[in-house]
């Protein structure tokens, strides 16, 4: 969806981003590129309501993990029918569906699953239904790592974001339960808990993990650029707002390919540069990360014996 005042925020010196982590470096793990493919055999899911959410907030990290051996999937929970500038609802759904195919190709994801809930109306969706569908996919795909909106994010205006986030959080846990949706097991699925979560947010967030995305920035920009209908909407919104003030930005004139690239660089690349600057990096993405409990595994590694 359209990011709240992204251009205004970028030109104002990233004032909102400064709120995300008031004490840079305190208790924050900086994740950098690993050599080889240490994650071969692992699977990740990007679970968002809107096509552009993942590219904007997490595509650099996802590209890094894919390069290191992960297989990745997109689970898009809404139909994105509201995100265009001058198309009808039906035209918008089709345009964003086509852009979805372009985005997963640009980022290197294996497949997209569209759940098809109506855009901006997900607070009308039964949580238990959405959670059940996610549990099915987490078990089917054997998801190890999830990227999604932070279920504890503050000041979130979009119901699609917080509804999806809350469903993801509970589904990650319940997908490992033997008594949760046991009919799945008759179809050949098995319990499977999601062990890692990378949560992002539009507003203030408890950031505890920063990922160096300088090596994968081109992949991120390509993923954002592939969301053509949505980014065109952003560009045309800015141009329309400026026209009301009798102003124009030559760099964004025409809202074509060049304008999309300029907007992507001006807003999203600069946003990641500001995040990187806070942590001594060229470009970075910030997350609240929840990983596996290492305590039991460490005990097992020290004390387990063969059967």
Where are these regions (language model features)?
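Active-site rim/loop-helix segments in enzyme catalytic domains that contact anionic ligands
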Residues: 21-141, 296
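Boundary at the C-terminal end of the N-terminal hydrophobic targeting segment
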Residues: 17-18
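Residues on a specific face of well-ordered alpha-helices
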Residues: 98-102, 165-166, 170, 218, ...
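Histidine-centered active-site/metal-ligand motif
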Residues: 50, 158-161, 227
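N-terminal secretory signal peptides and thylakoid transit peptides that target proteins
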Residues: 1-14
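Internal alpha/beta domain cores that form substrate/cofactor-binding pockets in large enzymes
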Residues: 73, 112-198
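Structural signal for conserved beta-strand scaffold positions within catalytic alpha/beta enzyme cores
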Residues: 46, 76, 114-116, 148, ...
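C-terminal accessory domains and tails appended to enzymatic cores
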Residues: 7, 27-31, 38-40, 177-193, ...
């Amino acid at each position: 969806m359209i990011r709240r005042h992204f251009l205004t925020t970028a030109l104002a010196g990233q004032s909102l981003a400064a709120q995300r982590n008031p004490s840079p470096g305190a208790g924050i793990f900086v994740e950098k590129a690993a050599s080889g493919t240490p994650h071969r055999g692992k699977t990740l899911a990007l679970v968002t309501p809107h096509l552009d959410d993942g590219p904007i907030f997490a595509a650099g990290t996802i590209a890094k993990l894919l390069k290191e051996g992960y297989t990745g999937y997109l689970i898009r929970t809404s139909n994105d029918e509201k995100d265009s500038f001058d198309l009808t609802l039906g035209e918008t759904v089709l345009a964003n569906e086509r852009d979805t195919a372009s985005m997963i190709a640009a980022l290197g994801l294996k497949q997209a699953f569209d759940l098809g809930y109506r855009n901006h109306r997900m607070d009308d969706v039964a949580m238990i239904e959405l959670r059940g569908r996610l549990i099915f996919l987490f078990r089917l795909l054997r998801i190890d790592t999830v990227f999604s909106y932070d279920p504890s994010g503050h000041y979130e205006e979009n119901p699609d974001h917080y509804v999806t986030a809350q469903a993801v959080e509970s589904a990650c846990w319940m997908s490992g339960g033997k008594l949760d949706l046991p009919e799945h097991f008759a179809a050949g699925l098995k319990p499977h808990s999601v062990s890692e979560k990378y949560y992002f947010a539009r507003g203030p967030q408890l950031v505890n993990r920063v990922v160096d995305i300088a090596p994968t920035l081109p992949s991120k920009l390509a993923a954002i650029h592939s969301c053509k209908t949505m980014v065109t909407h952003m560009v045309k919104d800015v141009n329309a707002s400026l026209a009301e003030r009798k102003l124009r930005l030559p760099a964004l004139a025409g809202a074509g390919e060049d304008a999309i690239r300029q907007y992507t660089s001006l807003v999203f690349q600069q946003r990641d540069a500001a995040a990187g600057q806070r942590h001594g990096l060229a470009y970075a993405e910030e997350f609240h990360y929840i990983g596996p409990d290492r305590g039991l595994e460490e005990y097992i590694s020290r004390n387990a014996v063969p059967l």
